[in-house]
Amino acid sequence: MKVRASVKPICEKCKVIKRKGKVMVICENPKHKQKQG
C-alpha cells in the first residue's frame, strides 16, 4: 500500500474507488494499491 497525495491508476486493471471519503486504487497487482493521505 502506497500513501500518496496524487493517486493515479498505473495499469489497465487499476480501479479508482472511494472508501469512507478517501480515494483509493485497487488492482490485481498488490504493488499498485494506493490510498490518498
Curated annotation (Swiss-Prot):
GO terms for cellular component: cytoplasm; ribonucleoprotein complex; ribosome. One of its GO terms (molecular function) is structural constituent of ribosome. Pfam families: Ribosomal_L36 (PF00444). SUPFAM superfamilies: Ribosomal protein L36 (SSF57840). GO terms for biological process: translation. Keywords: Ribonucleoprotein, Ribosomal protein. The keyword Cell membrane does not apply. It comes from the Bacteria. Coiled coil: none annotated. Belongs to the bacterial ribosomal protein bL36 family. This is Large ribosomal subunit protein bL36. It comes from Alkaliphilus metalliredigens (strain QYMF). The gene is rpmJ.
